[in-house]
């Protein structure tokens, strides 16, 4: 009903992970599954020594932005005109968010 994908950085940024995807099936929306998955991901990352989690979200996705902010993610920058959606004329801004985990 859902999955998440995390990529851990290497070298001097080995304390950082990028949360690339967190997705739930349409029928699971509103069930709390995404919240449980996010908490599971953050707990596992913290237990493995990760101290910083990064993610990006489309600027026109207020539901996802609010979701990430509820977990304490902070807006750290905007990548303007980051990409173009298929079949659309305009470009999409990508918002960069970060979260520092407890040591």
Give the residues covered by each predicted segment.
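Short glycine/proline-centered loop/turn elements that form peptide/ligand docking sites
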Residues: 34, 38, 60-64, 80-87
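Terminal substrate-recognition subdomain of acyl/acetyltransferases
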Residues: 87-103
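Conserved GNAT acetyl-CoA-binding A-motif
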Residues: 45-56
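Acetyl-CoA-dependent GNAT
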Residues: 1-27, 38-40, 44, 100-103
């Amino acid at each position: 009903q859902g999955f998440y994908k995390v990529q851990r950085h290497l070298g001097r940024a080995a304390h950082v992970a990028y949360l690339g995807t967190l997705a739930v099936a349409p029928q699971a929306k509103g069930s709390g599954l995404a919240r449980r998955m996010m908490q599971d991901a953050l707990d596992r990352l913290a237990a493995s020594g990760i101290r910083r989690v990064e993610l990006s979200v489309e600027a026109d996705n207020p539901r996802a932005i609010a979701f990430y902010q509820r977990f304490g993610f902070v807006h750290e920058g905007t990548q303007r005109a980051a990409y173009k959606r298929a079949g659309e004329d305009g470009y999409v801004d990508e918002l960069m968010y970060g979260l520092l985990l407890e040591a």
